[in-house]
Regions:
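Carbohydrate-interacting/catalytic domains
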Residues: 2-70, 97, 101-103, 371-374, ...
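Conserved alpha/beta catalytic core and glycan-binding cleft of carbohydrate-active enzymes
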Residues: 121-157, 247, 251-430, 435
Length: 569
């Protein structure tokens, strides 16, 4: 593997808005599956603390910590019963304070999930709300009378299937839940509710965290006529008119007084709307887009009816957002998270999955314009899991999709194959630390079964191999942060190359008269390229023994090259 050099002659400071998060690398931790310190089979905060030196070695700057708040765990912590307490299985508030302090000693910041579209039905706010129709917190949630015939108020459906309305016999009304019935939606129309949210956010920021990943934020505004949906799907609609008043207030009242990173999960946002969400004056620092990771999901969202796609579709999704960010705003670069399957299974043919293709895939996304996110295990090449039956799965969405497939006439084998391909449990299997029992994740039986390939794919093996994917990610991070090319990677203009190729993905980045090209072969066959530019120097590659020709390039299967090119091109 061709290595990169350390920065020797850093370029002069650029005259632009250089917020700290624009040059940071974020590592997402799903605590339940990261490292278990006490042998109960569940990852915890002390486990995260014990692995901080591993993350420091990788070179990341920020940890995004998935929910650790007090929760009944109906949806793995996204059903919060107390925003200002830690779930017992993860530890205590003292553990959280220690994590913040220990991370700070290593120059690592912590951001948390902010889940404010809904709470748990066991949150004190909801318990008060459902206790009496006249309670002052009744309007903190969305309650409606049913129809005269006894049916729910409208035909809206929840993300997890079925009606998004749940009947409460005590008060004889329905409450709204966009997700599980254990996750009632908050009523953002109520100013007292909004102020309570802002107060909670401020409390966490003053405790020392450095920002939030804002969960499902485009769900917070509902159509106030609550009319039936007449679309092909009746799933509750997102990004409704009037949402920007709420988001602007959230930013001003809770975010603006602190120098923080905010990244929004914002389904339903078009490219035209990106400036409002993530422009220089947007509501958030950046947002997660879905087009490039959901190419295989059709409009109906049925995993068992996958949408066909090819490399041109992936390239267009990337190009559309990158071209926008040339002019304004900032991107969140990612291929994996806790809601997605593993990227190697999604983007690489099964027979071609391995270190070479994994390094190619890492190169392609990591050097785009934006802040890169690495999901736990991605840096060692963890892959999807194939459990033998649906009973082995924990993910609510997987269970719903499986039974929906059976209802629509698919066989058990076909339904399970869809779950293998798309389940959120693919990314939630415990982190593979070594080849010992339970992959070194825990001394006890893990809450979710370990992937069977843990003996070959694990951290211990990766750290022993100088040519491993782990060290390749480490080099990519160095390239972004401490090389002569750091500023062109962070701030350079994006330009498509070979845009019509079905096998090659390539782009250029240019800043202050310095230009680099990223060229990757997504195929298992060698390809020869005639170049319209001159390669001056190869900066990084996933192959050894490169044959360099100034205006011609031969790429071997899944080969990727980062090179400096003539800036006059």
């Amino acid at each position: 593997m061709v290595q990169l050099s350390e920065r020797k002659n850093p370029e002069s400071a650029v005259t632009m808005n250089k917020q700290w998060w624009k040059e940071a690398v974020v590592y997402q931790i799903y605590p339940k599956s990261f490292y278990d310190s006490n042998g109960d089979g569940i990852g915890d905060l002390k486990g995260v603390i014990q692995k901080l030196d591993y993350l420091k070695e990788l070179g990341i700057d920020v940890i995004w910590l998935s929910p650790v708040y007090q929760s009944p765990m109906d949806d793995n912590g996204y059903d919060i019963s107390d925003y200002q307490a830690i779930a017992e299985e993860f530890g205590s508030m003292e553990d959280m304070d220690l994590l913040i302090d220990e991370a700070k000693k290593r120059n690592i910041k912590i951001i948390m999930d902010l889940v404010v579209n809904h709470t748990s039905d066991e949150h004190e706010w909801f318990l008060a709300s459902k206790s009496d129709v006249n309670h002052r917190k009744r309007d903190w949630y969305i309650w409606k009378d049913g129809k005269d015939d006894g049916n729910p108020p409208n035909n809206w459906e929840s993300i997890f299937g079925g009606s998004c309305w749940e009947y409460d016999e005590q008060t004889e009304q329905y409450y709204l839940h966009a997700f599980s019935k254990k996750q009632p939606d908050l009523n953002w129309e109520n100013p007292d509710l909004r102020n309570a949210v802002y107060k909670m956010v401020t409390w966490w920021l003053e405790k020392g965290i450095s920002g939030f990943r804002v969960d499902a934020i485009t769900f917070i505004k509902k159509r106030q006529d609550f009319a039936n949906s007449d679309g092909e799907m009746n799933v509750i609609e997102t990004n409704q008119e009037g949402i920007h008043e709420f988001l602007s207030e959230l930013s001003k009242q809770a975010f603006a007084s602190h120098d923080i990173l905010t990244v929004a999960e914002a389904p339903g946002v078009s490219h035209k709307e990106l400036p409002i969400y993530a422009g220089e004056e947007g509501h958030f620092s950046m947002l997660f887009e879905f087009d490039h990771v959901d190419l295989d999901v059709g409009k109906k969202g049925k995993w068992y009816e996958p949408h066909k796609w090819n490399l041109l579709d992936f390239k267009k999704a990337i190009s559309d957002s990158q071209t926008f960010y040339n002019n304004t705003g900032w991107g969140a670069l990612y291929l994996e998270n806790h809601d997605q399957p593993r990227s190697l299974n999604k983007f690489i043919k099964p027979e071609d999955i391995g270190p070479t293709s994994a390094k190619m895939l890492a190169t392609v996304y990591f050097l785009l314009k934006g802040t890169p996110f690495i999901y736990q295990g991605q840096e060692i090449g963890m892959t999807n899991v194939e459990y033998p039956s649906i009973e082995h799965y924990n993910d609510l969405a997987s269970i719903d999709q499986y039974h929906s497939a059976l209802k629509e006439g698919f066989s058990k084998e076909e339904a399970l194959a869809a779950i293998w391909r798309r389940s959120r449990d693919n990314s939630r299997t415990p982190m593979q630390w070594n080849h010992s029992q339970y992959a070194g994740f825990s001394q006890g039986t893990p809450w979710l079964e370990i992937n069977a390939n843990y003996s070959s794919i694990n951290v211990e093996n990766a750290l022993k191999d100088d040519n491993s994917l782990f060290y390749f990610y480490k080099n990519l991070i160095k390239l972004r942060k401490s090389s002569p090319y750091s500023e062109v990677i962070a701030f350079g203009k994006y330009e498509d190359l070979f845009e019509d190729s079905l096998q090659i993905m390539a782009y250029a980045r240019e800043f202050n008269n310095k230009k680099i090209a990223v060229i990757a072969n997504f195929g298992h066959k060698e390809v020869a390229l005639n170049l319209d530019f001159t390669m001056k120097e190869v900066i990084l590659s996933n192959y050894d023994h490169l044959e360099l020709h100034p205006n011609q390039l031969k790429l071997r299967p899944y080969e990727s090259i980062v090179c400096e090119i003539d800036s006059s091109f």
